[in-house]
């Protein structure tokens, strides 16, 4: 009989964890607070306490070929960037296809997870749950925490003097659902993240006036990239990652800023980040630049002070007659069912080895799935995290010593601060991270070997999109359809758009894409070498 594993949450992280446990012969029991799977992607017309909440118009920022489970592509006719209802439809189909629903206890709230008295030798946990007012406790050999990090809103009211005197409505973006109730209103959105920009542009169609207040600015990217292809299929590549991590810093930074300004010059729109070379996750919004051009959205600096009816910005300008302030100020990390000694934090950083395992426990029998954030998609990331975690729980994989894990955490955190900034503690380099995890379980593709044995596939794997299928090519959980999925991914990305075919479809040429991007720096390097 396999080890018993408690899984908290039935979103994409929880479903991936159930499947990974089954692949390793473990016995999963998943506890889900609501009455359905999907987590973040399950829309509700009201925000529920202790559960992620989205607005009705949410679309994905990752394209379908880059955000699927590695052995379960999205249907061919699904659009590249999907409405939340389409993603929920896909999640349900995945759960049914993999026969996962029978392992989930719905409407069950996990109230506490505690070490058993003999934890130092057994690694076991007491898990207490509540359902219909009744409490139950059970012993589990391991726990996988899949409750997400978009649950507890960060609403820093103390950072805004005078907010307590403001007479209009004031709430966090998690409580925003649709724009109709803001017809003719004057709205201030605080925060220039994905939610803030989405809400501001959506409200601009019905509200009288909309302003966005940003403390530090942000890069704003379009989902549509060169020649109309999805951005991530062109930018999230192994070759691109190699260049980014090996070019001289000055050239890498210059290229990054040039890439971010390819669509429009951010400085002219008041969007330029304070430190533009930091690789903080950009905002994905196709409407914001046009909304600013048309004057229906204005960008302002940080709010210095609120009055009863207005906001005074740091540049001295005033937005008067405000009806509503929406704080799109992100979320805080919290695991209320766990003792603080289990998952420690410091300086807004949760201390986890590779973003998954608490390093200071006697036994590595608790894992956090879905806590990292990157330019890559969540679903393939949590799939790989859960596969690794399941192997560690089973005993197939072993972790380094506590000292080695802490040294790795400290080293990585220094690199993160340099690359992403001090506040972006859960950001990571997607391909580097995925290769690291896949190497632990023997699922990392061997690129040199591929070039020798299957050059056609190797070219697509190295120069093409780093799609999820790459991490089911070899090793445990290998998917026989992975090779074909990689070679046909461009066809699937084009199919939903070909409702009026006007010519022969052509795949992008990776060589010319990168040559165009690096033409100037290559020329500069050549001149430098000649002169020296």
UniProtKB/Swiss-Prot annotation:
Secretion signal span: none
GO aspect biological process, one term: taurine biosynthetic process
Entry annotated with the keyword Transport: no
Pfam families: FMO-like
Record-given protein name: Flavin-containing monooxygenase 3
Encoding gene per record: FMO3
Subcellular location(s) per record: Microsome membrane; Endoplasmic reticulum membrane
Cofactor: FAD
Residues that coordinate or bind NADP(+): 60-61, 195-198
């Amino acid at each position: 009989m396999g080890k018993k594993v408690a899984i908290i949450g039935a979103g994409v992280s929880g479903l991936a964890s159930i499947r990974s446990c089954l692949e390793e012969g473990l016995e999963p029991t998943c506890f889900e607070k609501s009455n359905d799977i999907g987590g973040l992607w399950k829309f509700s017309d009201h925000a529920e306490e202790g559960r992620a909440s989205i607005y009705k118009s949410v679309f994905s920022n990752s394209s379908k070929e880059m955000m699927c489970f590695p052995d379960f592509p999205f249907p061919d006719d699904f659009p590249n960037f999907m409405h939340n209802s389409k993603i929920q439809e896909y999640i349900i189909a995945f759960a049914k296809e993999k026969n996962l629903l029978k392992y989930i206890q719905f409407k069950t709230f996990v109230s506490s997870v505690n070490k058993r008295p003999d934890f130092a030798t057994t690694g076991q946990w007491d898990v207490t749950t509540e359902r219909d007012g009744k409490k139950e406790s059970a012993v589990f050999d391991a726990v996988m925490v899949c409750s997400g990090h978009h649950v507890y809103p960060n609403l820093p009211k103390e950072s805004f003097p005078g907010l307590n005197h403001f007479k209009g409505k004031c709430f966090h973006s998690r409580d925003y659902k649709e724009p109709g109730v803001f017809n003719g209103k004057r709205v201030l959105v605080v925060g220039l993240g994905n939610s803030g920009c989405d809400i501001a542009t959506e409200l601009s169609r019905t509200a009288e006036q909309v302003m966005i207040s940003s403390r530090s600015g942000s890069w704003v990217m379009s989902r549509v990239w060169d020649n109309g292809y999805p951005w991530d299929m062109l930018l999230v590549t192994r070759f691109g990652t190699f260049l980014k991590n090996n070019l001289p810093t000055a050239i890498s930074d210059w290229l990054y800023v040039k890439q971010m300004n390819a669509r429009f010059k951010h400085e002219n729109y008041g969007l330029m980040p304070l430190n533009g070379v930091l690789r903080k996750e950009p905002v994905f919004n196709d409407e914001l630049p046009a909304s600013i051009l048309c004057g229906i959205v204005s960008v302002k600096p940080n709010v210095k002070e609120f009055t009863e009816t207005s906001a005074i910005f740091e540049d001295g300008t005033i937005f008067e007659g405000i009806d509503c302030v929406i704080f799109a100020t992100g979320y805080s990390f919290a695991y209320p069912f766990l003792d603080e000694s289990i998952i420690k934090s410091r300086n807004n950083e949760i201390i986890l080895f590779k973003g998954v395992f608490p390093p200071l426990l006697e036994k590595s029998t608790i894992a956090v799935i879905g806590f990292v954030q990157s330019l890559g998609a969540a679903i393939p990331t949590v799939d790989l995290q859960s596969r690794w975690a399941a192997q560690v729980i089973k005993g197939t994989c072993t972790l380094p010593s506590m000292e080695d894990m802490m040294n790795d955490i400290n080293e990585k955190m220094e690199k993160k601060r340099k690359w992403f900034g001090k506040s972006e503690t859960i950001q990571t380099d997607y391909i580097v991270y995925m290769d690291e995890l896949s190497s632990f379980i023997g699922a990392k593709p061997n690129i040199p070997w591929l070039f020798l044995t299957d050059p056609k596939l190797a070219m697509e794997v190295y120069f093409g999109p780093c799609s999820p299928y790459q991490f089911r090519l070899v090793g445990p959980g290998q998917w026989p359809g992975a090779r074909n999925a990689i070679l046909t991914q461009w066809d699937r990305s084009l199919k939903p758009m070909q409702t009026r075919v006007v010519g022969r479809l052509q795949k992008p040429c990776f060589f010319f894409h990168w040559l165009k991007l690096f033409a100037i720096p290559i020329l500069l390097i050549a001149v430098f070498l000649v002169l020296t």
